[in-house]
Amino acid sequence: MDLKAQSIPFAWLDRDKVQRLTNFLSNLENLENVDLREHPYVTNSCVVREGEDVDELKTLYNTFILWLMYHYVLSKRKPDYNAIWQDITKLQNVVNEYLKSKGLNKGNFENMFTNKEKFESQFSDIHRALLRLGNSIRWGSNVPIDTPYVNLTAEDSSEIENNLQDAEKNMLWYTVYNINDPWDENGYLVTSINKLVYLGKLFVTLNQSWSKLEKVAMSQIVTTQNHLSGHLRKNENFNAVYSQRVLQTPLTGQRVESFLKIITSDYEIIKSSLESYSASKAFSVPENGPHSLMDFASLDGRMPSDLSLPSISIDTKRPSADLARLKISQPKSLDAPLKTQRRHKFPESDSVDNAGGKILIKKETLGGRDVRATTPVSSVSLMSGVEPLSSLTSTNLDLRDKSHGNYRIGPSGILDFGVKLPAEAQSNTGDVDLLQDKTSIRSPSSGITDVVNGLANLNLRQNKSDVSRPWSKNTAANADVFDPVHRLVSEQTGTPFVLNNSDVAGSEAKLTTHSTETGVSPHNVSLIKDLRDKDGFRKQKKLDLLGSWTKEKNDKAIVHSREVTGDSGDATETVTARDSPVLRKTKHANDIFAGLNKKYARDVSRGGKGNSRDLYSGGNAEKKETSGKFNVDKEMTQNEQEPLPNLMEAARNAGEEQYVQAGLGQRVNKILAEFTNLISLGEKGIQDILHNQSGTELKLPTENKLGRESEEANVERILEVSDPQNLFKNFKLQNDLDSVQSPFRLPNADLSRDLDSVSFKDALDVKLPGNGEREIDLALQKVKAGERETSDFKVGQDETLIPTQLMKVETPEEKDDVIEKMVLRIRQDGETDEETVPGPGVAESLGIAAKDKSVIAS
């Protein structure tokens, strides 16, 4: 690794500091002391300041890089000390020879110099033994003398000691002190012992000092590495996770160099992760931690693109919150205000994108549980249950105008799209400003978008009064019985649809007079109260319901009728299922959403679930009409079914008489019924199934001679229209096939023909234009293998191989005879034997593939 300023991965430092750090590392062996701890100005160059404050994380990173580079240079510049060891072994041999001559060598002294590690570990014993031996040689006695060397002056001893200290401070660049005896006072043997002692001390000092600094550097590297990875563990973006994995790499002295290369290559990723952490540490992290992205799911099944989600509660003390965009609702009554609480986990939640913000709606709304949802744009709180009219003044409604119309929230808490409230009905809402928020939003594109966005913008305060669960036994069959104009009639398909008297021509419902205050006549209100106590509206067991469906499945048609009682008297009218305007709306909706009705296609076509076959049988329908009228109340008693509670039906069926008096039940039921019919999956009739691709409808015979429907005739008519023979009548390939090379080497067989009118037989026939002279010449050229003549072929004037028989003929007729004979011989004997003709066979050379037993050459 090159020690240049641009190659060392320091970050957030100015040029002077980087140059100072680079110079220190480049000139490390020239310093008096190579210990990094002895150079505080170098470590201070790693400090990164943000104004007057020190960025601890960035400073820690630069310190980490500095210690990595220090360890790298310390390892690369370390000498091997082999020269010192060679001198030690030479001097050891001199001493060993003397011991052998005196008979004192027993092998112990020699074994101490076998390897460097053993010498370094046993050097203290070697030192004492050498001093005792030198003193005995120099002074003639074995008396120990407390001197580091044998018969050296104090000045020499001091210089040697200084030399060892310098080697300890800088083991990368050292000098060897020369011990000599100019006046031969000690002799060669004693001088050799003094040199051996000094070199032994120098060798041990160099090794131990380097090992000490290497351990210090590794300790600093590991400590700084753990601190950095610990900081990045709190961040969850990709760069932080990747950098954390890199910093968690186990390091040893041998792996520092490779780790430095990884840091250098991933410098930008690690730098950006540290910058993002430094920028985010100024914001406080909540005690329960940030919400995980996987705890939330959007309505469309896609995850949000951003990695951070809005907080569940709004903290006005946080500097990052935009107070101008927050809308805090104030209660207008003595009811306790709703307090938004932080939830640590939302196991199931929906995310609705509304005007640039996220509205989190919990899915337990349907079960009557408490639901809280907030958004950064506006404080939204959707509560289960509907407040009565008396407490409506404490409700804060958040409504928005649309460019194509206004939609409001009536007293029942249900959206009324595209319908403007009359002045009389709007005056009954008390002190509530229905147009409190006039912020324009983007217009929805469909009915389902209107409902979803409208429900998301509800801002209803929780009511202390308990509202009973819709479809409970202490409530009427459903809330639709309170509306004298719209009534939900249950079809046998299980999907309710609206039977509206206002859609029937000549209906007497149009003559019903309504009060200007409530929209409902007082007489009808009293009748509605009486209807609640009737036995006909009480629920029947599900077993009886299934029994009644089975009994009427095959021999009765469904005829939807109702009995309407007005102020002038009782009037009864019948609307058949075939002529019902709702079925026309349903059919139109099914044409739009044709792909949504696959679920019940099998049941409808076979007369299964829903008994739709009887629905379109004219004979049974007319028989049902003549049998008499029946009251829809009794039909609801017999065919009672209990739909699954959902958000729309719970709000629709939770109405009380005060909502009817407000005059909004009609509009509400109409809008919700149209939406229900729009998304229904069970009302696709047989006419929609038989709807062909051209857009015309099949006219099926409804009666035969016996007055009953002829199912066989209908089936034949269906099969006749969808005749499989005519299915590919006009089928033709748009693009002609390109000419291909036949594997049998057909001579220019033209295969680029239409497949619908021409077979492959004509394309495979062999046709030689004229007398075939050109084709024969081309074929004979292919047989030219090895430039040799054979018994069957000879070289012509144009250097082409020509059959011998053709060399003797002159007229075209004779050539044709020769060719015919050759082909017959090929057919009888198979391909020409390889011994006779080398290379490709005659059939291949001629390019002819015979069919059957003869070949026609034209």
UniProtKB/Swiss-Prot annotation:
Domain of life: Viruses
Post-translational modification: Phosphorylated at multiple sites.
InterPro entries documented for this protein: Herpes_UL11/UL32
Pfam families (alphabetical): Herpes_UL32
UniProt region (Disordered), positions on chain: 603-629
GO cellular component: a single term: viral tegument
Keyword Phosphoprotein: yes
GO molecular function: structural molecule activity
Subcellular location: Virion tegument
Keywords: Phosphoprotein, Virion, Virion tegument
Subunit structure of this chain's protein: Homotetramer. Interacts with the major capsid protein. 180 tegument protein pU11 tetramers bind to the virion capsid.
Protein family according to the UniProt entry: Belongs to the herpesviridae large structural phosphoprotein family.
Protein name: Large structural phosphoprotein
Species classification: Viruses, Duplodnaviria, Heunggongvirae, Peploviricota, Herviviricetes
